[in-house]
Amino acid sequence: MEKRHIAVWIGLVLNLIFLGIIAYIPSALEPYRDQLDYQTQQLIEVLPYVKILMTGGIAAQLISLTFPRNQPKLGLIFAMIGGIIFVPLGFIFIVGYLYDYNRVVYSSLKSVPKLAQLPFEVLLKFNKQRQVSMAAMYAVLGVVLLVIGMDFGGIMVAVGIVLLINARRIQYYPMLAIAGDNLLFTPGQYAVCYEAPLSAFTVITDNRSALKLHIRTAELDRVFRIAKADLLQDEQNTLDKILARLKRPSVIQ
């Protein structure tokens, strides 16, 4: 089996532990059934069906790990199904799988290490503060919902934690950058930075909300999207310089 992101294994182990707890509770409480209140008795009745559903979720996660590199989309579908069944814990598995998915899709390109000291002509960074603000908003709202008794708050807290961890990670990668005749780009929140010739890119869409780029090389033909909300507010001029270079890749400014 090929190497996987550590979050995949952590997520899978946590989901298995949770499934074990769900399977154990009914047998542990059955001897005391007559002493339990009505709601707890109803919970004992429902948990076997939850166990079946979660067993299916684990099966979907395991199946997603068996797909070869030439079928990443199909593997991602199973990973999403299996992860969603286990939310909020399932988010850990999903995030790890998204890292692996992007790694496979862009495997033909050269990856750029964190904090790479390259002679950037133009550098566009992610808006870390926006990521942190969103993480805090989800976490605080989730805690409030949990306090008032709404279990959905747990999902929001989990999302907030994932966003916070990723905000710290993403600050070490450029969103877009130009070094020589190459474009460095991070194709998603859960991906690393890659490098390809400027001539391999075509601007598909450039509007107020998003930028879509088409990359075509001998091994890769793909469109990816960059949300402009992830840019710093004063970075439009920097983005314009990058777009100008993409339209005229041989011109050095």
Task: State what each model feature region is.
Residues 1-12, 37-39, 99-143:
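N-terminal membrane-targeting/pre-transmembrane regions
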Residues 4-9, 68-76:
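Membrane-interfacial loop-to-transmembrane alpha-helix junctions, especially the N-terminal start
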Residues 16-31, 44-70, 81, 91-100, ...:
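Alpha-helical transmembrane spans
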Residues 37-48, 77:
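Membrane-interface segments at the starts/ends of alpha-helical transmembrane spans
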Residues 75-83:
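Central hydrophobic cores of alpha-helical transmembrane segments
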Residues 163-195:
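Conserved beta-hairpin
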Residues 183-184, 192-212:
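Phosphoinositide-dependent membrane-docking surfaces
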Residues 212-241:
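Canonical phosphoinositide-binding patch of PH/PH-like domains
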